[in-house]
Amino acid sequence: MSGQGPPPSMTPQQQHMLMQQQQQQQMMRQQQMQQQQMQQQRQQQIQQQAQQPYQRARTPQMVPQGGSPGGAHLQMHPHLQPQGQMQPRSPLVGAQLQAPSSVPTAANPTTPQMMQQQMGMNQPMSLPPTHVSRPGSVAPPSSVPVNLQHTSGAPGLPGSQMEHQYPMHLQPQQQTLSRPGSQQSQHIQQPGSIQRPGSVLAPGSIPPGGPASQTGPQSIQVFGPGSVQPPGSTQAPSSVQPASTFNPGSIQAPASQQPPASVQPPPSAASGSTVAGAQSSKEPLKPNEEQIRMVQDPVDLVRNLVQKDLRNSLVEMNKRGAELVRQKQEGEVNEDGKAQYSRATNDFHAVCDEIDRTLTTVLETAKQLSKLDKVFFDRSSRDLDGEVMVNSVQNFVDNTEIVQRMFDDTIGSVTSSMESMRRRQKKWEDQHKNDDVEMME
């Protein structure tokens, strides 16, 4: 199709579009051929290096100096790895790395389909090239292209996934088997290196700052200090280690969990130890009469009022009344006696009003409880689910709001009708008054 020219009946726009499609198809074919060549070269290199025996260390102490202790811990415990990277561990991890001298320079993808295909195969948890620290003596040669990481993520290449998954878990035996100019020098930390890049499995914890910020991920603190730090000289200096280990005993309760200082129970119900612990720095506030009545039971409050306050006020009122009657019989009525009797009468009436309000509150509460008992349809099980209870109460509140809105609308409609009627009546009266004035003139 590429050798044939466009038919003469096509317009120039159609011919231009056809030429663009042919060019895109040719570029896609070239990219596919390059990917096939890369796959064949990698398979040949795997067959050559598969004969080199090596022994993988099984202890966290074999982590190279300057490596990531978190990576070694996750290597020994694969069940702690994220779900997106739980892949079978292959013995050919070190052998699947390709020498940069045999890697051809890949063309940049120009079509959106190829760009999405190449970028979609890369591991989402892999580190970008700028976050991997390496000494200057093992820098990769200039023949390695910058977009090698993108081209290695082509479909059908198992080495690309393992290369991004285990770059920081290679053991010292694998360093001796790698060739001097291979790509492994980009990921292995030498013993003389000071920087410690974080684990590839948790790149989100590595800040994009300088070398001091790449000492280790903070998400490995939950495993304990013994399982994430290698012994000896491979440990990080004290200036870059975490501030404190995971010790539940050292965690203090926040101040918000302590009882507030503004709300105090009555003296009869508060314990001395609780008040002393909560108000160690400040003097406890003395509860006034309103706070005491707020925390008391209404029934107990009525009982106390009847047994104490009502009796005392009644006795005081009778005493002042008898004194006033005696003074009246003697003919010497004192104004001070009248004031004391009035004060005693007011106190008695205040106690009676308080008892009336409290009993009214108790009765209204009992009515509301009887309504709520009808709301909960299932009263057989004592342990009701919180969600079911909230939904039932919410339905009751919604229905009550609907009824209240109906009353408000009715009252508002009647009020507006009365206002409009009065405005018309006033207007009619003003108009007839003007007519009467004109007739009189």
Curated annotation (Swiss-Prot):
Q: What do mutants without this gene show?
A: RNAi-mediated knockdown has no effect on seam cell division or differentiation, but in a sel-7 mutant background decreases number of seam cells. Partially suppresses the hermaphrodite gonadal development defect in a lin-12 mutant background.
Q: Determine if Hydrolase is one of this entry's keywords.
A: no
Which sequence ranges are marked TM in the entry?
Answer: none
Q: What Pfam families does UniProt report for this protein, alphabetically?
A: Med29 (PF11568)
Keyword tags = Activator, Nucleus, Transcription, Transcription regulation
Subcellular localization is given as: Nucleus
Q: Which GO terms describe its biological process?
A: lateral inhibition; positive regulation of Notch signaling pathway; regulation of cell fate specification
User: According to the UniProt record, where is the region Disordered?
Assistant: 1-294, 416-441
Q: Where is the composition biased (Low complexity)?
A: 13-52, 108-125, 132-146, 252-261
Which stretches does UniProt call biased (Pro residues)? 1-10
Recorded hits in InterPro entries, A to Z, give: Mediator/Homeobox_domain, Mediator_Med29_met
Function, as annotated, reads:
Component of the Mediator complex, a coactivator involved in the regulated transcription of nearly all RNA polymerase II-dependent genes. Mediator functions as a bridge to convey information from gene-specific regulatory proteins to the basal RNA polymerase II transcription machinery. Mediator is recruited to promoters by direct interactions with regulatory proteins and serves as a scaffold for the assembly of a functional pre-initiation complex with RNA polymerase II and the general transcription factors. Involved in development of gonad and seam cells.
Name of protein: Mediator of RNA polymerase II transcription subunit 29
Which organism was this protein described from? Answer: Caenorhabditis elegans
